[in-house]
């Protein structure tokens, strides 16, 4: 089982959306995603919950999680969300950084654009690694 960790500082927006899209698109027998942050916020941003609900994904009960060594153990890839020097680093883990704006406090139209960019990047990652769900 391949594990991808999507991480940002607060684990309340971008990384939550990315993990949710990944788990919707990837074959659960081949890969899964977790999301985490170095300084988890109290809840997922309301505007993120709203725009994800629009595409059929419910994040209303999702809780920000701290990125720990235990969580990272066994992961194949860490994808950070453009948080610059504050992005988490896990020694020995392959890392990619997606330079995406933080959706916190942005108008819903901007959060939708961020959501759509994340969905596009996640779909490309899943396809490139060969982790997509097989057609029934």
Describe each region flagged by the PLM.
Residues 1-68:
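Conserved active-site segments centered on acidic
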Residues 11, 52, 78-79, 118:
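Conserved small-residue
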Residues 72-74:
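Alpha-helix C-terminal capping/helix-to-coil transition sites in glycosyltransferase folds
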Residues 77, 83-136:
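Phosphate-binding/catalytic loops
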